[in-house]
C-alpha cells in the first residue's frame, strides 16, 4: 500500500515542480508498542519509519515536496470489528483470552467507540498540520504522555512500559 503509493507518486510529484505534500496514515500504535497487537503495531511502526526516511530524503532534494505521518489514536471507524469482513476460510482460530486480555480488549474497544474525534475531525487536523508544516500528526494530545514514556524507556534502556494497561478502577 504505502510503498507502492510512494513509488508511484513521488517521482511524479518531484517532476512537476509544484508544492506537494504526502500524508501517510499510520496509527499511534506506530509510536508505541502495546501488547497483543504485534502484527498491527509492526506494520504501523514501518509506516512511521518509512515516512521519517522519506522526509529525510526529500529535504535533501527539494523544498517543494514534503511528507507527514498521521498517527490517529481512538477514532470510531469500525476497525475493531474488521474481522467480520474476513472470509470464513481465512479467519484465525479463536484464542484463549486471559482475564487481563479481556480487560485490555474491552478498554480499547470502549476508548475507540467513545472517541469524541470523528474521521471528519481528523481530516481537518491533517489539513491544519500540513499548513503548519508539522511532520507528526497526533489526533489525541493526551497520548503524548505514553509516547514520552516509551522514549524514556528507550533512553534509560529499561523494559518497555505497558502504557495501554487498563487502569484499576478506583472506589470513590
Residue ranges of predicted features:
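Catalytic tyrosine of NAD(P)H-dependent dehydrogenase/reductases that use a Tyr as the general acid/base
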Residues: 3, 40
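Active-site helix of classical SDR
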Residues: 6, 43
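Active-site-adjacent segment of SDR/Rossmann-fold oxidoreductases
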Residues: 12, 16, 32, 53-65
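Rossmann-fold scaffold of SDR-type NAD(P)-dependent oxidoreductases
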Residues: 24
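Residue(s) in the substrate-gating loop at a strand-loop-helix junction
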Residues: 27
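Active-site loop immediately N-terminal to the catalytic Tyr-X3-Lys motif
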Residues: 34-39
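SDR active-site lid
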Residues: 59-136
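Non-catalytic terminal and boundary segments that flank Rossmann-like NAD(P)-dependent oxidoreductase
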Residues: 154-172
Amino acid at each position: 500500500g504505502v510503498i507502492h503509493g510512494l513509488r508511484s507518486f513521488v517521482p511524479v510529484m518531484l517532476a512537476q515542480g509544484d508544492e506537494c505534500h504526502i500524508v501517510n496514515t499510520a496509527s499511534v500504535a506506530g509510536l508505541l508498542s502495546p501488547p497483543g497487537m504485534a502484527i498491527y503495531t509492526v506494520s504501523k511502526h514501518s509506516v512511521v519509519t518509512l515516512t521519517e526516511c522519506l522526509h529525510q530524503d526529500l529535504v535533501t532534494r527539494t523544498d517543494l515536496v514534503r511528507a507527514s505521518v498521521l498517527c490517529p489514536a481512538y477514532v470510531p471507524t469500525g476497525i475493531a470489528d474488521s474481522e467480520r469482513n474476513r472470509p470464513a476460510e481465512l479467519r484465525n482460530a479463536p484464542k484463549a483470552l486471559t482475564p487481563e486480555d479481556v480487560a485490555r480488549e474491552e478498554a480499547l474497544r470502549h476508548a475507540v467507540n467513545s472517541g469524541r474525534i470523528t474521521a471528519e475531525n481528523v481530516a481537518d487536523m491533517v489539513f491544519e498540520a500540513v499548513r503548519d508544516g508539522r511532520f507528526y500528526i497526533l489526533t489525541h494530545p493526551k497520548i503524548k504522555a505514553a509516547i514520552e514514556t516509551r522514549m524514556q524507556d528507550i533512553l534509560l534502556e529499561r523494559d518497555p512500559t505497558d502504557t495501554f494497561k487498563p487502569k484499576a478502577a478506583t472506589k470513590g
